[in-house]
Curated annotation (Swiss-Prot):
ATP-binding RNA helicase involved in 40S ribosomal subunit biogenesis and is required for the normal formation of 18S rRNAs through pre-rRNA processing at A0, A1 and A2 sites. Required for vegetative growth. One of its GO terms (molecular function) is RNA helicase activity. Its EC number is 3.6.4.13. This is ATP-dependent RNA helicase dbp8. GO terms for cellular component: cytosol; nucleolus. It comes from the Eukaryota.
Length: 526
């Protein structure tokens, strides 16, 4: 039997119809009117009438406003990630959310206010397990959101019983501690939460008063917190005995042995806290070292669940973001400063925010003074500076008041400055893991970035070790129409840079700051 006429009018096809279509239209025109149905629910008194199966529309003209049909995704499967390499950089699929991880609504709202709407891979893996009370060792590349991975469950568990010092966060550098302090304050803004920052370079008396006031979370560097434990008295640090959660951020650096080790101070801090059987311990790092992995097998009390360990993109193939371009530039030892000046002045790099990493504080101090005389907008971050000046310089760089930050490895860990698109290794790092952390200051959270390493004749073995660590080879730096050697010869850059360097060294010998002001207590750099 022929198909009934649909209740909606059929658009007339302006093109030639097939023979099958003509037959179909002929049958429709000769059908008895009583056989027509205006809707599926219409009643028909003729029992012999049987509704046929619907046929596809005959017209090729679509109704206005009808959206194009899209193939449905298979049942139980999330929509595919649209960004190439999204999984590699730690971003999640569109269907994921913090609410699905059992995060409290007030925290979801706070994260949304901060434009953090979807959890990354490390956050999705760790947050549910931490909320269950498990100790955690989390490894994920730089810029993947490890701070939120431990801050959110800490704040959620604190909100259930907001009394006394609930958590302690230890981190190796003052700048990273300040950044974590500010992020925790922002996330906990809807609640009356009191964090406190305990770092070196500032007066201990206000810090002791703040500790005695029983803040809810303490963010500290190990050295300064250990000083308070040893010298500030029992009344000041007795609140630490009730801590329920401890976080070691950049755990590989905190637990490293050898010269400059922070391990003795970390042990002092942990000795003032409850035993491991009575608290939750979280370790996060971008480079999971054997010292960190060994903690998984340490003896545990019978009533504690096993340690949760996750390593997301921390092996050789994943330690460097896929959006990072790695290059090297061969430079002679005697003209390294001149090559750097020309490199910063090329058409592609002249306006890019950049961080220049040095191995020594004296090199960073000299480079800042020299580049300032060469008209670059530059500031610095290293241990020769007082803490107030370090904070001010970092704030200037974040606000784009300075385009270039010359720094030692104090700036290589944890600092999140989204505008940085270029990292220059003026000195090749001796440890390949330090290279991973340095170049991690750019190409964060899926953004693009470039890392350029200045390589001298004595640095070849160091570069090979770095390439083996990251699993990728560096390409030789090049820019269309740019020859650094040619510019050095033609433009007289060597003389200009030499004069700027001599003036900078003279300023250091006279004990003046970068603005030329006399400072009696300024350390001389020779």
């Amino acid at each position: 039997m022929a198909s009934p006429v649909p209740s909606e009018p059929v658009s007339e096809d302006t093109h030639d119809s097939s023979s099958g279509s003509e037959v179909e239209q002929s049958e429709i025109s000769t059908r008895a009117p009583k056989r027509r149905r205006l809707s599926e629910s219409s009643d028909d008194s003729d029992d012999s009438y049987v509704a046929p199966a619907p046929l596809p529309t005959l017209s090729r003209i679509k109704k206005k406003g009808a959206p194009d049909a899209k193939p449905a995704a298979p049942a139980g499967q999330d929509n595919p990630v649209l960004i190439r390499d999204a999984l590699e950089i730690g971003l999640r699929e569109e269907a994921s959310s913090f609410a699905a991880l059992n995060v409290a609504p007030w925290l979801v709202g706070s994260l949304t206010t901060m434009a953090v709407r979807k959890p990354t891979a490390i956050q999705k893996a760790c947050i549910p397990e931490i909320l269950k009370g498990r100790d955690c060792i989390g490894g994920s590349r730089t810029g993947s959101g490890k701070t939120i991975a431990f801050s959110v469950p800490m704040l959620q568990k604190w909100a259930e019983d907001p009394f006394g010092i609930f958590g302690v966060v230890l981190t190796p550098t003052r700048e990273l501690a300040l950044q974590i302090f500010e992020q925790i304050k922002a996330i906990s803004a809807p609640q009356s939460m009191k964090p406190v920052l305990i770092t070196g370079g500032t007066d201990m008396r206000p810090q002791a008063i703040a500790l005695a006031g029983r803040p809810h979370v303490v963010i500290a560097t190990p050295g300064r917190l250990a000083d308070h434990i040893k010298s500030s008295g029992e009344d000041t640090v007795c609140g630490l005995k009730r801590v329920r959660m401890v976080v070691l951020d950049e755990a590989d650096r905190l637990l490293a042995s050898g010269p400059g080790s922070m391990l003795p101070d970390v042990e002092t801090c942990l000795s003032a806290l409850p035993p491991s059987s009575e608290r939750q311990t979280l370790l996060f790092t971008a480079t999971v070292t054997p010292e960190v992995r060994a903690l998984k097998n340490m003896p545990r009390s019978a009533n504690k669940p096993p340690v949760f360990v996750t390593e997301i993109s921390t092996e050789n193939q994943g330690s460097i973001p896929p959006t990072l371009k790695q290059t090297y530039l061969k430079v002679p030892l005697t003209h390294r400063e001149a090559f750097l000046h020309v490199l910063l002045s090329t058409e592609d790099n002249a306006s890019r925010p950049a961080i220049i990493f040095c191995n020594h504080t004296k090199t960073a101090d000299l480079l800042e003074r020299m580049l300032r005389r060469l008209t670059h907008r530059v500031t610095s971050l290293h241990s020769l500076l007082p803490q107030s000046e370090r904070n001010a310089n970092l704030a200037r760089f974040r606000a784009s008041a300075a385009r270039i930050l010359v720094a030692t490895d104090v700036a290589s860990r944890g600092l999140d400055i989204p505008t940085v698109s270029l990292v220059i290794n003026y000195d090749v790092p001796r440890n390949p893991d330090d290279y991973v952390h340095r170049v991690g200051r750019t190409a964060r959270a899926g953004r693009s970035g470039e890392a350029i390493t200045l390589v001298g004749q004595r640095d070849v073995q160091l570069v090979l070790a770095i390439e083996e660590r990251v699993g990728r080879q560096m390409e030789e730096w090049s820019e269309e129409g740019v020859s650094i050697e040619g510019r050095l010869v033609r433009t007289g850059v060597l003389k200009e840079v030499g004069e700027a360097k001599r003036e900078a060294m003279g300023e250091i010998d006279e004990g003046r700051d970068v603005l030329g002001r006399k400072r009696n207590k300024l350390k001389k750099v020779r």
